[in-house]
């Protein structure tokens, strides 16, 4: 299956000059969604993953079903103030300003084998921040997996030393 056929391209969203890769058409198509989840889960099946981590919000869409398929736990990474218990936090820069990501302090055990799963790799800023949170919690990142990678933005360079998988690659 060519997953790229299931991605809608929206020009000028969220602002002029951007060619937005819309995954809602992929997750709406039961065969494409299952294929994407199965491809990543298949890649992870022999890696003894304890926990799949998914960043808010679209990382939840792929991370949770992959964790279920593997028989692993799922850990959500949320924006500040969304988790009800003690958290670990990291501040990261956005194009205009900054934001804070958090996980529960007890969500990852020391030595847990972790797969980080998200929908899209662009500049790598958010992903590298999540990597720091996972490592701060004591997790061992086994692999970082994406449905889409925007190769021209060179996010993979911020993830050197990690095993990175992407199912679809776009030159923007």
Curated annotation (Swiss-Prot):
Q: What is its EC number?
A: 2.4.2.7
Principal location listed in the UniProt entry: cytoplasm
MF terms in GO: adenine binding; adenine phosphoribosyltransferase activity; AMP binding
Which keywords does the record carry? Cytoplasm, Glycosyltransferase, Purine salvage, Transferase
Entry's transmembrane regions: none
Any GO CC annotation of this UniProt entry: cytoplasm
Quote the pathway field: Purine metabolism; AMP biosynthesis via salvage pathway; AMP from adenine: step 1/1
Kindly give the HAMAP family that the UniProt entry links to this protein.
Aden_phosphoribosyltr (MF_00004)
Task: Please explain the role this protein plays, according to its UniProt record.
Answer: Catalyzes a salvage reaction resulting in the formation of AMP, that is energically less costly than de novo synthesis.
What subunit structure does UniProt give? Answer: Homodimer.
Record-given protein name? Adenine phosphoribosyltransferase
List the source organism.
Clostridium kluyveri (strain ATCC 8527 / DSM 555 / NBRC 12016 / NCIMB 10680 / K1)
Gene name linked to the record: apt
């Amino acid at each position: 299956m060519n997953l790229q056929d299931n991605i809608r391209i929206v020009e000028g969203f969220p602002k002029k000059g951007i060619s937005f890769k819309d995954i809602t058409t992929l997750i709406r198509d039961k065969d494409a969604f299952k294929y994407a989840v199965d491809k990543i889960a298949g890649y992870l099946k022999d890696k003894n993953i304890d926990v799949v981590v998914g960043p808010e919000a679209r990382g939840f869409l792929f991370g949770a079903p992959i964790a279920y398929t593997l028989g692993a736990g799922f850990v959500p990474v949320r924006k500040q103030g969304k988790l009800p218990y003690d958290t670990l936090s990291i501040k990261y820069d956005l194009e205009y300003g900054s934001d804070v990501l958090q996980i529960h302090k007890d969500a990852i055990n020391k030595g847990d084998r972790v797969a980080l799963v998200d929908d899209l790799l662009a500049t790598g800023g958010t992903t590298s921040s999540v990597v720091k949170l996972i490592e701060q919690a004591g997790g061992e990142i086994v692999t970082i997996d994406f449905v889409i990678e925007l190769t021209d933005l060179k996010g993979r360079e911020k993830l050197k030393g990690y095993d990175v998988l992407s199912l679809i690659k776009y030159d923007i």
